[in-house]
Amino acid sequence: IDEENIKVTMADFEKALLEVKPAFGASTTLFERCMLNGMISHGETHEKLVSTMESLIEQVRVSEKTPMLTCLLEGSAGTGKTALSAALAIKSQFPFTKLFSPDTFVGAPEAKKCADLAKLFDDAYKSPVSLIVLDDIERLLEYVDVGPRFSNVILQALLVLLKRQPPP
């Protein structure tokens, strides 16, 4: 290889940019995978829920009195809670949107999950507005119906992180 004749062109630079995944920002790929079949309206109640969620997102975007808002979607498995959250995250166009799913932590110890949760929230604080989707909280907490058993360490971390106000 003739090192003196190696040249990096703008095309090379642009190609490299396509390969880079930003540490911050809105990564819509994971959210898009959560709604492969799109969103289907399930009537008036569903539309009211979507409207309420969009209002909450807008409130966080424009209100100085609401630096943080926590919302829980509860329902049976397979009813579209994750898909709805993903659609709203994409639609929000917030500069920082992330999905935190137990799928990425198979076999990970509690300490790693807690550390990654804390880092996620710390990263979110660096953006003017952020949206974090905590998917499948029961699995994240390692909840088991029989017993019942769950990870108190992860629960305590979530309780602290979900209540802690962002720094000014």
Regions found by a protein language model. Give the residues of each.
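AAA+ P-loop ATPase motor domain of ring mechanoenzymes
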Residues: I1-Y143, F150-P168
